[in-house]
Design a protein with these regions (language model features):
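Non-transmembrane, aqueous-exposed alpha-helical and coiled segments at domain scale
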Residues: 2-23, 29-31, 35-207
């Protein structure tokens, strides 16, 4: 298994999150989640501790069935899709607490301040400041994660957004040294596949 690949393993009736062959959550670090509801409670607990809007994670989890439908929708059906993607983006705030390759705890407050500003308010090519923050703290954000965050700023999967997405990812690659990881096929079907992969990292049920 690739060292950057995540999987959820059922061991003796309990779910464990793995990054490659390494266990990410251990019983000593956090409660073991046996259901998606327990996962939600775990995320909400830390959301409250760090002052993050808990409605975001609730919306994300409640949209689970709609995400499944989204994977089969076409490009021109943009209204609800964007609302769903915006809710999907928020889950990344909470994942920073568990993902060992993302921002370290010492920079959490700065991360929570900078992420919304650079993902939602600035043109995609100006995400370099956000990328530089990630690189400066020794963190790595996987390309497909960044894609999903950037999609919150795009109104639809269209050719107008294509160049900006690639440019932002190139900036990410240069800053993090992960340029070799971003050579992917930027078609609508390919992006949908990445989104499906992204979702499975946060949901215990298989899509």
């Amino acid at each position: 298994m690739n060292n950057n690949e995540y999987s959820i393993r059922n061991i003796d009736g309990k779910y464990y999150l793995y990054c490659g062959d390494a266990q990410v959550l251990t019983p000593e670090e956090a409660p073991i989640c046996t259901t998606s509801e327990e996962l939600a409670k775990l995320l909400l607990r830390d959301a409250e501790e760090y002052g993050v809007d808990t409605e975001n994670v609730l919306s994300t989890l409640s949209y689970h069935s709609l995400y499944c439908d989204l994977l089969h929708q076409e490009e021109d059906e943009e209204g609800e899709n964007i609302e769903m993607f915006n809710n999907l983006i928020h889950i990344d705030y909470f994942w920073a607490f568990y993902e060992p390759r993302t921002i370290r705890a010492a920079a959490l407050s700065q991360y929570l301040d900078v992420l919304p500003k650079h993902v939602n308010d600035l043109p995609l090519h100006q995400n370099a400041a956000y990328v530089n923050l990630m690189a400066a703290t020794g963190s790595i954000i996987l390309p497909h994660k960044l894609v999903c965050m950037l999609l919150s700023e795009t109104s639809r999967f269209s050719i107008e957004n294509y160049d900006e997405l690639v440019l932002a990812l190139e900036s990410y690659g240069q800053a993090s040294g992960a340029a070799e990881d971003i050579d992917v096929d930027w078609t609508f079907d390919s992006i949908k596949k990445m989104v499906k992969t992204f979702i499975t990292y946060y949901m215990l049920e298989s899509l």
